[in-house]
């Protein structure tokens, strides 16, 4: 069978799996999620052995350090994966929920009710945990999913998927609901972008800029984009110095390879000489390289000079760009020029300044006095996330189970006819 025929058959099977999930009860979907988590734990030795193969290949292939860090699984991380599936099981089932209801003068009762999207294709790179997160969120929201991970993590993904399939079978749910592309052939991506003979309803890319750009340019079905995290922390003149140090240090250094990591520090010119030195000192002691503009280097001469490309670079490494700006307006202008619309934060004790920042910064997530590393579906109470959507339609910010639904209008009458 040709690759195109194989992929088309996968799409048709996914459509059948979506139909089965749509009519499954919330209790059945919850049971499936618990069974999936149990199977991941039971298969931990096989999954970690598969991950070791991917890591060995990554080392020989010269994969970048941030990519390797994202790829790596250990017992603790794998337990987090299983716990994440259980967290999705614990969130309220989004299907069948009435989001609005009203009665017309003619007596028609109209309700807007959440329903699954249908079949979702997930194209992602480096992160084997996405296999479990995407599967869990799609099962919770009643969607079938076709997973296509990167070749760098194919062994890990296949092992996790095998565990998920066991869990689904144990719960009486068809394995057609969660399928994985087993070949690293890039033509498989092209087939998915073509919609697999109109069986795919939504494509979600999660990876580097080039992957997302290709999907958005070539897809013949709807795309929910997850762009890079060019995130900023703006330290306002009215910031508490202690909070500023702690928030910036956490935003940058807690885990540098995640999309919620801060890549640029903006400091208010009105207080830069007071606020910047302790922040810079803390970052340097933590092993972070600072690349600053002229005004910031005048305050902290140890910084390397920033070049134009730095302001639009997602480092995913212990590196941060630093710029001095003129208040909230200057910070917002810098973010508008270089940001990705992902996550941006302000540190300030001035409520009016915070509200002005919120109004001016048009990002999916805007934080006040909190680290950008909270840009995560689990931290939002979504159980897990399938990505951070930076577009404005259909969802925005962390994409959890609720964001993977659409709606239908249910109209109940008593025999009305239209005059």
UniProtKB/Swiss-Prot annotation:
GO MF, any single term: glutamate-5-semialdehyde dehydrogenase activity
Keyword Oxidoreductase on entry: yes
Enzyme Commission number: 1.2.1.41
NCBIfam families: PRK00197.1, proA
Keyword NADP applies: yes
Catalytic activity field: L-glutamate 5-semialdehyde + phosphate + NADP(+) = L-glutamyl 5-phosphate + NADPH + H(+)
Keywords: Amino-acid biosynthesis, Cytoplasm, NADP, Oxidoreductase, Proline biosynthesis
Alphabetized HAMAP family for the sequence: ProA
Classification lineage: Bacteria, Pseudomonadati, Pseudomonadota, Alphaproteobacteria, Caulobacterales
Its job: Catalyzes the NADPH-dependent reduction of L-glutamate 5-phosphate into L-glutamate 5-semialdehyde and phosphate. The product spontaneously undergoes cyclization to form 1-pyrroline-5-carboxylate.
Record field: transmembrane: none
Encoding gene (name): proA
Family from the record: Belongs to the gamma-glutamyl phosphate reductase family.
SUPFAM superfamilies: ALDH-like
Superkingdom of the source species: Bacteria
Pfam families xrefs: Aldedh (PF00171)
Pathway named in the protein's UniProt entry: Amino-acid biosynthesis; L-proline biosynthesis; L-glutamate 5-semialdehyde from L-glutamate: step 2/2
GO biological process: L-proline biosynthetic process
Enzyme class: oxidoreductase
Subcellular localization: Cytoplasm
Major place of residence: cytoplasm
Protein name (database record): Gamma-glutamyl phosphate reductase
